[in-house]
A protein has these predicted regions:
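Re-entrant/interfacial helical elements at transmembrane boundaries that shape
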Residues: 69, 102-111, 162-166, 184-186, ...
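Hydrophobic core segments of alpha-helical transmembrane domains in multi-pass membrane transport
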Residues: 16-30, 45-55, 87-93, 138-151, ...
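Inter-helical loop and helix-membrane interface segments of multi-pass membrane transporters/permeases
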Residues: 1-7, 29-40, 106-131, 178-190, ...
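Transmembrane alpha-helix boundary signature
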Residues: 56-67, 95-105, 178-180, 241
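Structural signature of hydrophobic alpha-helical transmembrane segments
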Residues: 42, 46-54, 127-139, 187-200
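C-terminal transmembrane helix-loop-helix hairpin of multi-pass membrane proteins
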Residues: 2-14, 39, 176-242
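Helix-loop-helix junctions within the multi-pass membrane cores of secondary transporters/permeases
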Residues: 82-172
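N-terminal alpha-helical transmembrane segments of multi-pass membrane transport
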Residues: 2-84
Length: 242
């Protein structure tokens, strides 16, 4: 019997990471055929990752997820469209700017851009580039959530904004600088990750539950896919015009 409330989430996090660990170990031992370097440090780091992921997810479930859903419900009940849309944008922006995957991508992109002489090879230039990239992606996610919330309120079909986003991506890709296209497409994949997905889903479901005539199943979902498309558009625009 698991009495400690953290034991079950800890085991769940371990099982989530187990396939990754298994792949790394199998290739290290059987394909590369080299001993695992610094085993003690590797084990300690893995335990830290599992514990950190466990605490992180538990913290979100206890605080931000219920808060996001309840605030969406309250805003919808009060009928203030302006503040609801403002909240949607700020929630999307705030979730994306704190997304660990976006931070990692921005830092890596800055290092590569510096090595390729696209930006100056100084820490200040790399920090500024990474910050600008993070803000661009976060702004794109904020806009996506705003439009997604407006879609739920107005009852628009989900494919309207999605088709428009795909059309913009297809039209912009041939004209975007080659050095930004890969970053733009990857930013779309990682923009909806650990923090963004649960918060955005909670917002959509809470809003669809509160609005009369909306179904949480058919109307509450669909925000995440749009939030993964707009960063591609905004990052390519950043590369073209900035």
């Amino acid at each position: 019997m698991l009495k400690n409330p953290l034991i079950k989430p800890f085991l769940s996090s371990f099982l989530d990471l187990a396939p990754i660990l298994a792949v790394v170990l199998i290739f290290q031992v059987f394909i590369i055929q080299q001993p695992v370097p610094d085993v003690a440090r590797l084990i300690a780091g893995t335990l830290f990752v599992i514990l950190g992921l466990t605490l992180f997810i538990q913290g979100l479930q206890l605080s931000l997820f219920p808060l996001g859903e309840s605030m969406a419900y309250d805003f919808a009940r009060k009928g203030s469209l302006f503040w609801l849309l403002a909240f949607a944008f700020c929630l999307g922006f705030g979730a994306a700017i704190a997304e660990p995957a976006i931070i990692a991508l921005a830092k890596k992109a800055a290092n590569i851009a510096s090595a390729a002489n696209i930006i100056e090879q100084t820490n200040t230039a790399k920090s500024n580039y990474a910050l600008e990239l993070r803000i661009t992606i976060a702004f794109a996610v904020g806009v996506a959530i705003l439009i997604g919330v407006l879609r739920i309120i107005r009852g628009w079909p989900a494919y309207y904004p999605i088709f428009c986003a795909y059309a913009c991506i297809a039209l912009m890709t041939p004209f975007a600088p080659a050095n930004i296209i890969g970053i733009a497409y990857d930013s779309g994949c990682i923009a909806t990750s650990t923090i963004t997905v649960p918060l955005v889903t909670a917002l959509g479901v809470g809003l669809a539950t509160a609005i009369k005539g909306r179904n949480p199943i058919t109307d509450g979902f669909g925000l995440v896919v749009f939030a993964s498309l707009t960063p591609i558009i905004f990052v390519m625009a950043y590369g073209m015009f900035v």
